[in-house]
């Protein structure tokens, strides 16, 4: 049995190792996480074969569920992208006279972000911000920051996004509940971190026109886009199916055949599978796409997820090493003796790791590995709440090490200092508000 000092030192050094290898030596996060896994296993006295077996089971156990859901989610997002469904939502919201332009961008980011990776969402939806900025003579910062803050929020707290799904799965949280809580917290955090924060700045927010190099980017002709009803039905269908499963678990007898049916169709794999074929028809065939064209789009989408699958698999390996060694159990005792609330701890660890490793996904996986061992000591706090707390922490600290920071800077034509002052601050405020919302939820449920 290793001393607590040895355990803490091993964990801290492993985190430093991950940060250094990614930031300093430019290792891929997959390699960095595997290296840290071998390091922890060695320091905790695991045998070589035990380490390899733990890593294999960690990768396989994690991707066995997540690979299918992420793959299906990628198809859904790709169909949203190529059909123009995301633009349809934005154009429809523009007609709501009672909504300000910045609030519209938050809603666009939250709704469309459910099925889009955050960077893809920025690239796909920023032309809408350009269009509104030109029409209303509004600073681009006032539109782009709420959009990107909302996309980041939904990316971190709402399954079926890969990191949020990983956290929910590893903590044993109900995915339907996490979706509902995540949307509530994400909406509140995005509105306060985006529009309200920028309203507070007032005239101190500089006017930024659409950069000349992006002046040609335009929203597609509205006549070519799918209808709003078809778009919303496709986006919300998998979420509705997963929520039906959650409701059934709370209110139905588990022996009934109808309960089994709802459990089946509400499983994330089944729900996403059904949604993909609905998307093929509603956003593809009805938009005059051939099956050959949709196959090409599907294959192109799959090419983009190899990176995230490898990172998530390595995160599962790191988690498995912590559990297989005695580190996880000892860490649970140490953390409980710190007398820090587990929600605050989960948020803080994710926040710090995001700033350090430049990836919200890696930060959330690392935070899960650190926080998960102590959950049995707090039976009154649901795993769904801890999942939201981890995601809330990962929203913040979008700084120069994060690719999203540079996307915002480039598209807004902002200086480095301006991007720090307005976008980094917006994500940090959103993160703090999300933490407050998580605490509030913990008192209610």
Residue ranges and their predicted role:
Residues 2-11, 62-71, 117-121, 184-187, ...:
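Structural signature of hydrophobic alpha-helical transmembrane segments
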Residues 7-19, 26-46, 67-72, 230-243, ...:
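Hydrophobic mid-bilayer segments of alpha-helices in multi-pass membrane transport proteins
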Residues 8-13, 31-34, 67, 102-107, ...:
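Hydrophobic alpha-helical transmembrane segments
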Residues 48-135, 288-375:
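Membrane-embedded alpha-helical segments and adjacent helix-loop junctions characteristic
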Residues 99-114, 137-156, 174-191, 342-354, ...:
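Alpha-helical transmembrane segments of multi-pass membrane proteins
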Residues 131-239, 404-441:
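Membrane-core helix-loop-helix motifs of multi-pass transport proteins
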Residues 186, 342-445:
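C-terminal transmembrane helix pair
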């Amino acid at each position: 049995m290793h001393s607590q000092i040895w355990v803490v030192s091993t964990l801290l050094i492993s985190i430093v190792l991950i940060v250094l290898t990614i930031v300093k030596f430019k290792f891929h996060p997959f390699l960095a996480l595997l290296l840290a896994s071998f390091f922890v296993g060695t320091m905790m006295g695991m045998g070589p074969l035990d380490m390899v077996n733990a890593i294999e089971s960690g990768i396989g156990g994690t991707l066995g569920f997540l690979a299918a859901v992420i793959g299906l989610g990628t198809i859904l997002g790709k169909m949203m992208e190529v059909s123009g469904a995301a633009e349809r939502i934005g154009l429809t919201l523009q007609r709501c006279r009672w909504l300000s332009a910045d609030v519209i961008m938050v809603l666009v980011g939250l709704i469309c972000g459910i099925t889009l990776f955050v960077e893809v969402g920025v690239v796909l939806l920023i032309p809408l911000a350009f269009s509104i900025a030109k029409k209303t003579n509004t600073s681009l910062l006032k539109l782009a920051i709420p959009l990107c803050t909302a996309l980041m929020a939904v990316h971190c707290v709402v399954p079926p996004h890969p990191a949020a799904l990983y956290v929910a799965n590893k903590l044993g949280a109900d995915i339907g509940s996490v979706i509902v809580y995540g949307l509530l917290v994400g909406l509140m955090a995005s509105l306060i971190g985006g529009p309200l924060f920028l309203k507070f700045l007032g005239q101190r927010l500089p006017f930024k026109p659409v950069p000349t190099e992006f002046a040609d980017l335009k929203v597609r002709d509205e006549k070519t886009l799918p209808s709003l009803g078809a778009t919303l039905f496709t986006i919300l269908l998998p979420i509705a199916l997963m929520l039906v499963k959650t409701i059934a678990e709370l209110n139905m007898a588990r022996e009934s055949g109808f309960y089994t049916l709802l459990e089946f169709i509400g499983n994330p794999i089944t729900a996403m599978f059904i949604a993909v074929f609905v998307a093929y028809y509603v956003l593809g065939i009805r938009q005059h796409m051939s099956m050959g064209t949709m196959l090409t789009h599907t294959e192109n989408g799959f090419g983009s997820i190899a990176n995230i699958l490898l990172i998530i698999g390595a995160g599962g390996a790191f988690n498995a090493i912590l559990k297989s060694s005695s580190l996880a159990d000892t860490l649970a005792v140490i953390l409980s003796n710190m007398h820090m609330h587990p929600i605050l701890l989960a948020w803080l660890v994710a926040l710090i790791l995001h700033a350090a490793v430049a990836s919200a996904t890696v930060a959330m996986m690392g935070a899960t590995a650190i926080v998960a061992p102590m959950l049995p000591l707090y039976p009154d706090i649901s795993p769904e709440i801890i999942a939201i707390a981890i995601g809330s922490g990962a929203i913040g600290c979008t700084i120069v090490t994060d690719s999203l920071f540079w996307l915002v800077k480039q598209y807004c034509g902002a200086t480095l200092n301006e991007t720090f002052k307005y976008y980094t601050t917006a994500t940090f405020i959103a993160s703090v508000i999300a933490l407050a919302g998580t605490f509030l939820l913990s008192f209610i449920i």
